[in-house]
Amino acid sequence: MEINIIAAVAANRAIGYQNDVVYFIREDLKRFKQLTTGHTVIMGRKTFHSLPKGALPNRRNIVLSRTETDFPGCDVYSSLEEALKHIGAEEKAFIIGGVSLYKEALAIADHLYLTEIAATPPQADVFFPEYNDGTWIVESREERPAADDNPAYAFVNYVRK
């Protein structure tokens, strides 16, 4: 099984404010869809509730929750460890949030697929965990200039050393 983390991260590692993204970048959403379609996505309860249309289409959706169990279109497990037991050896799984799940998955992930945004949002209340600790090396980096209402950003793929 391949475990991947995917996130859009501002310069100060901000990823959210009031259960929404801090920057809405259309190309980032296209990349997210392209990378995750046909695979398993694993998320926490709050991340599921932040999705405008519920479960993501054309993906196996797994929600981690110890309290709620009603997540239409999703498999529900109480922990990441339990969820991983139900994913096949040849499958790709993408951790899509929230922050506590990102923290836990950083220790076991094979790849990070980050959109690194070269700006700091005016408000943020959720931050991606520190990841520049020497564990990861850059596999590829695709820079995008600021345009329209979007700040400059880069699609950066990291692989575990």
What is each PLM-predicted segment?
Residues 4-40, 45-161:
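Flexible, gly/pro- and Lys/Arg-enriched active-site loops
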